[in-house]
Swiss-Prot record:
Any one GO molecular function term: transaldolase activity
Gene Ontology cellular-component terms listed: cytosol
Entry annotation: catalytic residues: 132
Gene name of the record: tal
Name under which the protein is recorded: Transaldolase
Record keywords, A-Z: Cytoplasm, Pentose shunt, Schiff base, Transferase
Entry-linked Pfam families: TAL_FSA
Entry EC no(s): 2.2.1.2
Subunit note: Homodimer.
Annotated pathway: Carbohydrate degradation; pentose phosphate pathway; D-glyceraldehyde 3-phosphate and beta-D-fructose 6-phosphate from D-ribose 5-phosphate and D-xylulose 5-phosphate (non-oxidative stage): step 2/3
Family membership: Belongs to the transaldolase family. Type 1 subfamily.
Protein backbone atom coordinates (compact mmCIF):
# COMPACT_ATOMS: atom_id res chain seq x y z
CA UNK A 1 0.00 0.00 0.00
CA UNK A 2 1.17 3.54 -0.72
CA UNK A 3 2.31 5.73 2.17
CA UNK A 4 -0.04 8.17 3.86
CA UNK A 5 1.97 11.05 2.40
CA UNK A 6 1.44 9.72 -1.13
CA UNK A 7 -2.28 9.28 -0.52
CA UNK A 8 -2.56 12.74 1.04
CA UNK A 9 -0.94 14.27 -2.05
CA UNK A 10 -3.77 12.82 -4.16
CA UNK A 11 -6.34 14.72 -2.07
CA UNK A 12 -4.51 17.89 -1.02
CA UNK A 13 -1.66 20.09 -2.23
CA UNK A 14 1.19 19.40 0.22
CA UNK A 15 3.36 22.37 1.20
CA UNK A 16 6.60 22.28 3.22
CA UNK A 17 6.67 24.54 6.28
CA UNK A 18 10.42 25.12 6.47
CA UNK A 19 13.32 27.17 5.16
CA UNK A 20 15.57 24.10 5.05
CA UNK A 21 16.25 23.45 1.36
CA UNK A 22 17.60 19.95 2.02
CA UNK A 23 14.35 18.95 3.73
CA UNK A 24 12.29 20.49 0.93
CA UNK A 25 14.26 18.56 -1.70
CA UNK A 26 13.63 15.33 0.21
CA UNK A 27 9.84 15.59 0.44
CA UNK A 28 9.16 17.31 -2.92
CA UNK A 29 6.24 19.54 -1.88
CA UNK A 30 4.37 21.74 -4.34
CA UNK A 31 5.07 24.97 -2.41
CA UNK A 32 7.01 26.12 0.64
CA UNK A 33 6.27 28.60 3.41
CA UNK A 34 8.70 30.58 5.55
CA UNK A 35 8.27 32.98 8.46
CA UNK A 36 10.67 35.07 10.61
CA UNK A 37 11.24 32.14 12.99
CA UNK A 38 12.07 29.76 10.13
CA UNK A 39 14.37 32.33 8.46
CA UNK A 40 16.21 32.77 11.79
CA UNK A 41 16.57 29.00 12.07
CA UNK A 42 17.76 28.68 8.47
CA UNK A 43 20.27 31.51 8.92
CA UNK A 44 22.03 29.41 11.54
CA UNK A 45 22.64 26.53 9.09
CA UNK A 46 26.27 26.63 7.92
CA UNK A 47 25.34 26.04 4.27
CA UNK A 48 23.38 29.30 4.27
CA UNK A 49 26.42 31.49 5.11
CA UNK A 50 26.97 32.46 1.43
CA UNK A 51 23.35 33.66 1.22
CA UNK A 52 23.91 35.87 4.27
CA UNK A 53 27.15 37.25 2.80
CA UNK A 54 25.42 38.00 -0.50
CA UNK A 55 22.56 39.73 1.34
CA UNK A 56 25.00 41.88 3.33
CA UNK A 57 26.85 42.84 0.14
CA UNK A 58 23.55 43.88 -1.43
CA UNK A 59 22.58 45.97 1.61
CA UNK A 60 25.94 47.75 1.75
CA UNK A 61 25.56 48.72 -1.89
CA UNK A 62 22.16 50.29 -1.12
CA UNK A 63 23.01 52.43 1.90
CA UNK A 64 25.76 53.58 4.27
CA UNK A 65 23.34 53.70 7.20
CA UNK A 66 23.83 50.66 9.42
CA UNK A 67 20.20 50.45 10.55
CA UNK A 68 19.06 50.48 6.92
CA UNK A 69 21.73 47.93 6.04
CA UNK A 70 20.39 45.55 8.69
CA UNK A 71 16.82 45.94 7.42
CA UNK A 72 17.85 45.47 3.78
CA UNK A 73 19.99 42.44 4.65
CA UNK A 74 17.08 40.75 6.44
CA UNK A 75 14.75 41.38 3.50
CA UNK A 76 17.29 40.18 0.95
CA UNK A 77 18.13 37.12 3.04
CA UNK A 78 14.46 36.09 3.06
CA UNK A 79 14.38 36.60 -0.72
CA UNK A 80 17.66 34.75 -1.28
CA UNK A 81 16.40 31.78 0.74
CA UNK A 82 13.15 31.97 -1.21
CA UNK A 83 15.04 31.95 -4.52
CA UNK A 84 16.93 28.80 -3.49
CA UNK A 85 13.70 27.11 -2.40
CA UNK A 86 12.08 27.97 -5.75
CA UNK A 87 14.79 25.91 -7.46
CA UNK A 88 13.34 22.79 -5.82
CA UNK A 89 9.58 23.47 -5.64
CA UNK A 90 7.45 23.87 -8.77
CA UNK A 91 4.97 26.22 -7.11
CA UNK A 92 5.22 29.19 -4.79
CA UNK A 93 7.29 30.49 -1.89
CA UNK A 94 5.61 32.43 0.92
CA UNK A 95 7.76 35.26 2.30
CA UNK A 96 6.57 37.20 5.33
CA UNK A 97 6.35 40.94 5.93
CA UNK A 98 7.97 42.16 9.17
CA UNK A 99 5.55 41.30 12.00
CA UNK A 100 6.11 44.74 13.54
CA UNK A 101 4.07 46.13 10.64
CA UNK A 102 1.05 43.99 11.54
CA UNK A 103 -1.04 47.04 12.52
CA UNK A 104 0.28 49.32 9.77
CA UNK A 105 -1.54 48.94 6.46
CA UNK A 106 0.58 51.42 4.51
CA UNK A 107 3.84 50.12 5.98
CA UNK A 108 2.86 46.54 5.09
CA UNK A 109 2.03 47.50 1.50
CA UNK A 110 5.36 49.32 1.10
CA UNK A 111 7.34 46.40 2.56
CA UNK A 112 5.47 43.89 0.38
CA UNK A 113 6.24 45.90 -2.75
CA UNK A 114 9.92 46.02 -1.75
CA UNK A 115 10.05 42.24 -1.32
CA UNK A 116 8.30 41.69 -4.65
CA UNK A 117 10.74 44.06 -6.38
CA UNK A 118 13.68 42.11 -4.93
CA UNK A 119 12.22 38.89 -6.31
CA UNK A 120 11.37 40.48 -9.66
CA UNK A 121 14.88 41.93 -9.99
CA UNK A 122 16.19 38.37 -9.54
CA UNK A 123 13.95 37.15 -12.36
CA UNK A 124 11.24 35.64 -10.15
CA UNK A 125 7.73 36.46 -11.36
CA UNK A 126 4.79 37.30 -9.11
CA UNK A 127 3.01 34.02 -9.85
CA UNK A 128 5.67 32.18 -7.83
CA UNK A 129 5.44 34.36 -4.72
CA UNK A 130 2.98 34.78 -1.87
CA UNK A 131 3.42 37.70 0.51
CA UNK A 132 2.60 36.67 4.07
CA UNK A 133 0.78 39.12 6.31
CA UNK A 134 -0.74 38.73 9.77
CA UNK A 135 -4.55 38.47 9.68
CA UNK A 136 -5.14 41.72 11.54
CA UNK A 137 -7.70 44.16 10.10
CA UNK A 138 -4.76 46.26 8.89
CA UNK A 139 -3.01 43.25 7.37
CA UNK A 140 -6.20 42.22 5.56
CA UNK A 141 -6.63 45.73 4.17
CA UNK A 142 -3.01 45.70 2.97
CA UNK A 143 -3.67 42.38 1.23
CA UNK A 144 -6.76 43.85 -0.44
CA UNK A 145 -4.58 46.61 -1.94
CA UNK A 146 -1.82 44.22 -2.98
CA UNK A 147 -4.17 41.70 -4.60
CA UNK A 148 -5.48 44.46 -6.88
CA UNK A 149 -1.86 45.11 -7.93
CA UNK A 150 -1.35 41.46 -8.88
CA UNK A 151 0.54 40.59 -5.70
CA UNK A 152 -0.98 37.46 -4.17
CA UNK A 153 -1.05 37.20 -0.39
CA UNK A 154 -1.01 34.51 2.29
CA UNK A 155 -2.83 35.70 5.42
CA UNK A 156 -1.30 34.00 8.43
CA UNK A 157 -1.79 33.88 12.21
CA UNK A 158 -5.46 33.19 11.56
CA UNK A 159 -7.33 31.89 14.60
CA UNK A 160 -10.91 33.22 14.42
CA UNK A 161 -13.80 32.79 12.04
CA UNK A 162 -14.02 36.61 11.85
CA UNK A 163 -10.48 36.74 10.45
CA UNK A 164 -11.31 34.06 7.88
CA UNK A 165 -14.50 35.77 6.77
CA UNK A 166 -12.80 39.17 6.44
CA UNK A 167 -10.02 37.61 4.34
CA UNK A 168 -12.50 36.04 1.93
CA UNK A 169 -14.42 39.30 1.63
CA UNK A 170 -11.17 41.13 0.84
CA UNK A 171 -10.46 38.69 -1.99
CA UNK A 172 -7.12 37.46 -0.65
CA UNK A 173 -5.47 34.60 -2.50
CA UNK A 174 -4.83 32.27 0.46
CA UNK A 175 -5.28 31.95 4.21
CA UNK A 176 -3.28 29.90 6.72
CA UNK A 177 -5.62 29.01 9.60
CA UNK A 178 -3.58 27.59 12.48
CA UNK A 179 -4.48 24.20 13.91
CA UNK A 180 -1.92 23.23 16.54
CA UNK A 181 -1.75 26.59 18.28
CA UNK A 182 -5.53 26.55 18.72
CA UNK A 183 -5.32 23.06 20.21
CA UNK A 184 -2.46 24.16 22.50
CA UNK A 185 -4.66 26.90 23.97
CA UNK A 186 -7.62 24.61 24.66
CA UNK A 187 -5.38 21.85 26.01
CA UNK A 188 -3.84 24.28 28.50
CA UNK A 189 -7.23 25.73 29.43
CA UNK A 190 -9.13 22.45 29.79
CA UNK A 191 -6.22 20.29 30.93
CA UNK A 192 -6.98 17.42 28.55
CA UNK A 193 -5.97 15.90 25.26
CA UNK A 194 -8.30 15.80 22.26
CA UNK A 195 -9.08 13.09 19.75
CA UNK A 196 -8.05 14.33 16.30
CA UNK A 197 -11.66 14.45 15.10
CA UNK A 198 -12.67 16.78 17.96
CA UNK A 199 -9.41 18.79 18.01
CA UNK A 200 -10.49 22.47 18.28
CA UNK A 201 -8.01 23.47 15.57
CA UNK A 202 -9.35 20.82 13.20
CA UNK A 203 -12.92 21.89 13.95
CA UNK A 204 -11.98 25.54 13.24
CA UNK A 205 -10.38 24.84 9.85
CA UNK A 206 -13.20 22.49 8.85
CA UNK A 207 -15.75 25.23 9.60
CA UNK A 208 -13.81 27.82 7.61
CA UNK A 209 -13.39 25.45 4.65
CA UNK A 210 -17.09 24.56 4.61
CA UNK A 211 -18.09 28.25 4.81
CA UNK A 212 -15.84 29.21 1.90
CA UNK A 213 -17.12 26.37 -0.26
CA UNK A 214 -20.77 27.03 0.62
CA UNK A 215 -20.52 30.66 -0.51
CA UNK A 216 -18.18 30.04 -3.43
CA UNK A 217 -15.21 32.06 -2.20
CA UNK A 218 -12.05 31.44 -4.23
CA UNK A 219 -9.65 32.09 -1.33
CA UNK A 220 -7.45 29.02 -0.84
CA UNK A 221 -7.58 27.37 2.60
CA UNK A 222 -4.16 26.10 3.71
CA UNK A 223 -4.20 24.48 7.15
CA UNK A 224 -1.03 25.22 9.13
CA UNK A 225 0.69 24.74 12.49
CA UNK A 226 0.22 21.03 13.09
CA UNK A 227 1.20 19.14 16.24
CA UNK A 228 0.64 15.58 14.99
CA UNK A 229 -0.33 13.67 11.85
CA UNK A 230 -3.77 12.95 13.29
CA UNK A 231 -4.68 16.63 12.83
CA UNK A 232 -3.35 16.55 9.27
CA UNK A 233 -5.29 13.43 8.29
CA UNK A 234 -8.54 14.88 9.67
CA UNK A 235 -8.10 17.71 7.13
CA UNK A 236 -7.38 15.48 4.11
CA UNK A 237 -9.09 17.15 1.17
CA UNK A 238 -8.32 20.70 2.33
CA UNK A 239 -7.07 22.89 -0.54
CA UNK A 240 -3.52 22.88 0.84
CA UNK A 241 -1.75 21.83 4.03
CA UNK A 242 1.63 23.24 5.07
CA UNK A 243 3.54 20.64 7.07
CA UNK A 244 6.87 20.63 8.94
CA UNK A 245 9.62 18.19 7.83
CA UNK A 246 9.29 15.98 10.93
CA UNK A 247 5.57 15.43 10.29
CA UNK A 248 6.18 14.92 6.56
CA UNK A 249 8.56 12.13 7.57
CA UNK A 250 5.94 10.57 9.87
CA UNK A 251 3.45 10.58 6.99
CA UNK A 252 6.10 9.08 4.69
CA UNK A 253 6.68 6.27 7.20
CA UNK A 254 2.98 5.57 7.81
CA UNK A 255 0.72 3.22 5.86
CA UNK A 256 -3.04 2.68 6.01
CA UNK A 257 -5.91 4.30 4.17
CA UNK A 258 -6.24 8.10 4.06
CA UNK A 259 -9.89 9.13 3.85
CA UNK A 260 -11.00 12.40 2.26
CA UNK A 261 -12.56 14.42 5.10
CA UNK A 262 -13.12 17.84 3.50
CA UNK A 263 -15.14 17.96 0.28
CA UNK A 264 -15.71 20.99 -1.95
CA UNK A 265 -19.47 21.43 -2.36
CA UNK A 266 -19.04 24.11 -5.08
CA UNK A 267 -21.74 26.15 -3.40
CA UNK A 268 -23.17 29.37 -4.81
CA UNK A 269 -25.19 30.55 -1.82
CA UNK A 270 -25.77 34.31 -1.71
CA UNK A 271 -23.01 35.91 0.33
CA UNK A 272 -23.66 38.14 3.34
CA UNK A 273 -22.71 41.82 3.24
CA UNK A 274 -19.02 42.43 3.92
CA UNK A 275 -18.05 42.96 7.56
CA UNK A 276 -17.33 46.48 8.75
CA UNK A 277 -14.25 47.21 10.85
CA UNK A 278 -16.45 47.45 13.94
CA UNK A 279 -18.14 44.11 13.21
CA UNK A 280 -14.77 42.46 12.62
CA UNK A 281 -13.37 43.71 15.93
CA UNK A 282 -16.51 42.70 17.82
CA UNK A 283 -16.64 39.20 16.34
CA UNK A 284 -12.89 38.57 16.67
CA UNK A 285 -12.84 39.78 20.27
CA UNK A 286 -15.63 37.38 21.22
CA UNK A 287 -13.01 34.64 20.88
CA UNK A 288 -10.48 34.93 23.73
CA UNK A 289 -8.31 32.18 22.25
CA UNK A 290 -7.99 34.03 18.94
CA UNK A 291 -7.23 37.36 20.60
CA UNK A 292 -4.52 35.82 22.75
CA UNK A 293 -2.93 33.67 20.03
CA UNK A 294 -2.89 36.44 17.39
CA UNK A 295 -1.11 38.84 19.75
CA UNK A 296 1.20 36.07 20.94
CA UNK A 297 2.08 35.05 17.38
CA UNK A 298 2.89 38.60 16.30
CA UNK A 299 5.04 39.14 19.39
CA UNK A 300 6.97 35.91 18.86
CA UNK A 301 7.64 36.61 15.18
CA UNK A 302 8.81 40.12 16.11
CA UNK A 303 11.17 38.67 18.74
CA UNK A 304 12.73 36.33 16.19
CA UNK A 305 13.00 39.15 13.65
CA UNK A 306 14.88 41.12 16.32
CA UNK A 307 17.22 38.18 16.96
CA UNK A 308 17.94 37.92 13.24
CA UNK A 309 18.72 41.64 13.10
CA UNK A 310 21.16 41.33 16.01
CA UNK A 311 22.86 38.42 14.27
CA UNK A 312 23.11 40.40 11.02
CA UNK A 313 24.35 43.57 12.76
CA UNK A 314 27.21 41.60 14.29
CA UNK A 315 28.31 40.49 10.81
CA UNK A 316 28.14 43.89 9.13
Amino acid sequence: MSTKLEQLRALTTVVADTGDIEAISKYQPEDATTNPSLILKAAQIAEYAPLIDASIAYAKAQSNDKTQQVADTCDMLAVNIGKEILKVVPGRISTEVDARLSYDTEGSVIKARQLIKMYNDAGITNDRILIKLASTWEGIRAAEVLEKEGINCNLTLLFSFAQARACAEAGVFLISPFVGRIMDWYKAKEGRDFESSEDPGVVSVTGIYDYYKTYGYNTVVMGASFRNIGEILELAGCDRLTISPNLLQELEDATGEVVEKLIDTNGTKERPAAMTHAEFLWEHNQDPMAVEKLADGIRNFAVDQGKLEVMIAERL
